[in-house]
């Protein structure tokens, strides 16, 4: 306080030494007033004492009862509260300290009798006499999925959650792991979120089953997992997502997660990439973990790689592996996946190969004997009986209940005269012939390079222009094949049959509809040509490949999926965005070149026909007629037949190709309409003209022999392709089929607009995830 504001200064009073200061602001009470207040208090005390002497309830202090009425009111107000329960004895805590929990009846976290409740465990029914004898702390309760999740799960997802819970809790046998092998788009992520949330929150013993879990995924999907947990749980749980950051921060966060054993862990779920887990496995493998989930689990197909071995060192018995394609190349890879989740279920690798793999593969060939086929069938059934205990698989036929119809087409495109001359000269080259003669069971790196060269040539001569200039192997005498007006940096679609067809179809789509298109290739060089074509025709586009950062990918996908955005093309590297990416903003997809691994193509082609799609979808697979691309397609058919036999339990999977057929990669017939159709030996076609339709119970998941076969543009389900066939004159043959009938009924407004404009109406949809890293090598090539 300032001295000028002090009372002594304001009042002008000077204090003498040893004189007490009297505040001038307090009013002095006179003696008469004080005496009156004391008399009133004495009267009140006397009244209270008088009532107490009669055994009645004491009146409130300072309450003056001037009449019987006022006295009655005073007695009511002074009465203590009494709990309206018969024979109730109040408990005021006694000698218990704060924080001591009262003994309560054990019960489930959620009501098992509620509507739409998903009960994962039902305890035994006890009689009242048994309950009296039992320890109250040992009574088991129901395990019920949180209604927040159970109310949004579809029937097949409820079944999947129940299956995984039974497996990880050891209720299906002497194992605690499982493989969720549902095909793309069936909601594997949501099912895992439900499982993790349930195990972290409850058990039949009224406590959490696990205290923490680790989810390992490709680096580009770490952020997507975090978004899924936030989306479905509405922020009720936080995850520790390891993406970016310094080495010191990463080590500190992982050590804290690994060492913490509290049931109240702030971030009980660790989201980490395969690469990061491998680097810091020494930290994460020190302490026990409740459960581990491996997304895109087919990355663990090789039991010898460091990532597989690092994950096997994790101290946990509960292992869940997610993969829509457990069998990609051979049964050895399948064994690695099963052995990861449940070690020793199938024995050692040598035992598995001797007891299962060799007999089954022998029976797959068309030239196998009846005895070999019978033994293969026995071993197949035995293997199925074992793995069915820990694997669940549903096909995307389930999606037909929720998604519009999908048309899938395999289009055989003729090579142009320039491509044809390049192709034949390459095969006639002495250097190429010598390298092929040296190939054994395992193809040499030289042969693999030759295969890659032919694949690029089938797409466009621009992709092999540098090899031609360098007079590389196979192009020693090919300098004069290109036209005189050829410009390497100016795309000419007329030099490639597939680019001519693509050019005509894109122009027709752009002129006659508001559909968006996804262009997918295994090579970033092909994406460069897509860009040149888009700029040439002034199409708006976005591009996603391995050079794009993960943060930018999500923005690009959101921009394309926005129905208000006019972006026409989405160019995608199959290795960068083939897994987990949602592109439901488009309903037409071109798979420009095939991959050795059918799983990669299946993953890439599933980007548009996904949950949230409202328009009919058209999938186009382009292959060069009679070329090495058709041979790759045939190899895919062989692998898919193996997968359908083991995974889908399809005993009648047809066997159309021998191994000798698959070795004939470098043969070429320029006059054939479709080498694949010829080798199918189709009984429904006469001179390449279909005379009998496929069976009614087939769809686009059936074998190519059970698809529609067209050698002309009649009967095609897509007018865009029919017009381009006539205009480009480069299509030789088409296989096509559709999914089951559309289950979602369009509104009357949508139907009317479709009738008026022949264009499916736009629907608002916006959903995104992130993709995998880019890799243009043919890593799944296994030799011939």
UniProtKB/Swiss-Prot annotation:
Please list the residues that bind ATP.
182-189
Residue span of region Required for chromatin remodeling, strand pairing activities and coupling of ATPase activity = 2-9
Query: Region Disordered: which residues?
Result: 742-784
Instruction: Give every Helicase C-terminal domain span.
Output: 501-658
DNA damage found in the keyword field: yes
Q: Does the keyword Repeat apply?
A: no
Q: Where in the cell is it found?
A: Nucleus
Q: Where is this motif: DEGH box?
A: 295-298
The protein's GO terms of the molecular function aspect are: ATP binding; ATP hydrolysis activity; ATP-dependent chromatin remodeler activity; DNA binding; DNA translocase activity; helicase activity
Write out the biased-composition intervals (Basic and acidic residues).
745-754
Protein keywords: ATP-binding, Cell cycle, Cell division, DNA damage, DNA repair, DNA-binding, Helicase, Hydrolase, Meiosis, Mitosis, Nucleotide-binding, Nucleus, Phosphoprotein
Query: EC number(s) per UniProt?
Result: 3.6.4.-
What GO terms describe the biological role, i.e. biological process, of this protein? cell division; chromatin remodeling; DNA synthesis involved in double-strand break repair via homologous recombination; double-strand break repair via homologous recombination; double-strand break repair via synthesis-dependent strand annealing; meiotic DNA repair synthesis; oocyte fate determination; oogenesis
Residues with the modification Phosphothreonine, per the entry, are 22
The superkingdom listed in its UniProt entry is Eukaryota
Top EC class, one word: hydrolase
Q: Which residues form the Helicase ATP-binding domain?
A: 169-344
Task: Give the matching Pfam families.
Answer: Helicase_C, Rad54_N, SNF2-rel_dom
Gene3D superfamilies membership: P-loop containing nucleotide triphosphate hydrolases (3.40.50.300), SWI2/SNF2 ATPases, N-terminal domain (1.20.120.850), Tandem AAA-ATPase domain (3.40.50.10810)
CC per GO annotation: nucleus
For this chain, the family text in UniProt reads: Belongs to the SNF2/RAD54 helicase family.
- Main function: Involved in mitotic DNA repair and meiotic recombination. Functions in the recombinational DNA repair pathway. Essential for interhomolog gene conversion (GC), but may have a less important role in intersister GC than spn-A/Rad51. In the presence of DNA, spn-A/Rad51 enhances the ATPase activity of okr/Rad54.
> Subunit structure, briefly?
Interacts (via N-terminus) with spn-A/Rad51.
**Could you identify this protein by its name?**
DNA repair and recombination protein RAD54-like
């Amino acid at each position: 306080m300032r001295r000028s504001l002090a009372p002594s200064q304001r009042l002008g009073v000077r204090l003498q030494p040893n004189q007490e200061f009297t505040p001038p602001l307090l009013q002095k009470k006179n003696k008469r007033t004080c005496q009156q207040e004391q008399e009133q208090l004495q009267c009140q005390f006397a009244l209270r004492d008088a009532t107490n002497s009669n055994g009645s309830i004491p009146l409130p202090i300072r309450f003056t009862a001037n009449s019987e009425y006022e006295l009655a009111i005073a007695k009511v107000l002074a009465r203590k509260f009494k709990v309206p329960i018969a024979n109730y004895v109040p408990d005021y805590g006694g000698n218990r300290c704060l924080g001591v929990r009262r003994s309560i009846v054990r019960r489930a976290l959620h009501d098992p009798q509620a509507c739409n409740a998903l009960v994962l465990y039902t305890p035994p029914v006890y009689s009242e006499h048994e309950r009296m004898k039992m320890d109250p702390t040992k009574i088991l309760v129901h395990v019920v999925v949180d209604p927040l999740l159970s109310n949004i799960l579809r029937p097949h997802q409820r079944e999947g959650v129940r299956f995984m819970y039974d497996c990880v809790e050891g209720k299906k046998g002497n194992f605690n792991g499982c493989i969720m092998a549902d095909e793309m788009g069936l909601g594997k992520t949501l099912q895992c979120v439900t499982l993790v949330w349930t195990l972290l929150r409850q058990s039949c013993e009224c406590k959490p089953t696990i205290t923490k879990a680790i989810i390992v995924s490709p680096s580009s999907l770490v952020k997507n997992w975090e978004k899924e947990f936030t989306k479905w749980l509405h922020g009720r749980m936080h995850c520790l997502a390891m993406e970016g950051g310094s080495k010191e921060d990463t080590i500190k966060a992982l050590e804290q997660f690994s060492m913490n054993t509290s049931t109240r862990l702030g971030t009980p779920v660790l989201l980490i990439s395969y690469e990061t887990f491998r680097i810091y496995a020494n930290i994460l493998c020190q302490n026990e973990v409740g459960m581990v989930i491996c997304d895109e689990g087919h990355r663990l197909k090789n039991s010898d790689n460091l990532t597989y071995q690092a994950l096997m060192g994790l101290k946990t018995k509960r292992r869940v592996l997610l993969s829509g394609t457990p069998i990609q190349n051979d049964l050895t890879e399948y064994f690695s996946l099963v052995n990861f989740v449940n070690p020793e279920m199938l024995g050692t690798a040598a035992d598995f190969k001797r007891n299962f793999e060799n007999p089954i593969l022998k029976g797959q060939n068309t030239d196998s004997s009846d005895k070999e086929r019978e033994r293969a069938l026995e071993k197949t059934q035995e293997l199925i009986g074992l793995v069915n205990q820990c694997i669940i698989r549903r096909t995307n036929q389930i999606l037909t209940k929720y998604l519009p119809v999908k048309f899938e087409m395999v289009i055989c495109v003729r090579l142009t005269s320039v491509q044809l001359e390049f192709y034949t000269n390459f095969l006639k080259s002495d250097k190429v012939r010598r390298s092929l003669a040296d190939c054994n069971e395992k193809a040499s790196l030289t042969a693999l390079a030759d295969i890659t060269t032919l694949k690029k040539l089938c797409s466009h001569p621009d992709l092999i222009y540098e090899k031609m200039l360098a007079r590389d192997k196979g192009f020693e005498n090919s300098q004069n094949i290109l036209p005189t007006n050829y410009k390497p940096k100016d795309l000419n679609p007329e030099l490639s049959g597939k680019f001519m067809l693509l050019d005509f179809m894109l122009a027709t789509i752009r002129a006659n509809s508001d559909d968006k298109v996804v262009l997918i290739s295994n090579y970033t060089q092909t994406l460069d040509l897509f860009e040149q074509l888009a700029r040439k025709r002034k199409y708006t586009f976005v591009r996603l490949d391995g050079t794009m950062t993960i943060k930018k990918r999500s923005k690009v996908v959101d921009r394309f999926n926005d129905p208000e955005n006019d972006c026409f093309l989405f160019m995608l590297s199959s290795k960068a965005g083939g897994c987990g990416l949602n592109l439901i903003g488009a309903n037409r997809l071109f798979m420009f070149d095939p991959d050795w691994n059918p799983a990669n193509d299946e993953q890439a082609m599933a980007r548009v026909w996904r949950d949230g799609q409202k328009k009919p979808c058209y999938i186009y697979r382009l292959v060069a007629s009679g070329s090495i691309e058709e041979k790759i397609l045939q190899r895919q058919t062989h692998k898919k037949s193996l997968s359908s036999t083991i995974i889908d339990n399809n005993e009648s999977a047809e066997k159309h190709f021998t191994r000798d057929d698959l070795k004939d990669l470098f043969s070429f017939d320029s006059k054939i309409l479709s080498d694949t159709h010829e080798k199918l030996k189709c009984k429904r076609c006469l001179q390449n003209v279909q005379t009998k339709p496929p069976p009614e119970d087939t769809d686009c998941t059936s074998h190519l022999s059970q698809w529609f076969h067209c050698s002309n543009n009649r009967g095609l389900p897509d007018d865009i392709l029919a017009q381009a066939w006539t205009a480009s004159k480069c299509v030789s043959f088409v296989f096509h089929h559709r999914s089951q009938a559309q289950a979602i009924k369009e509104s009357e407004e949508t139907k009317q607009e479709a009738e008026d404009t022949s264009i499916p109406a736009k629907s608002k949809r916006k959903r995104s995830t992130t993709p995998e890293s880019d890799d243009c090598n043919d890593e799944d090539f296994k030799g011939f």
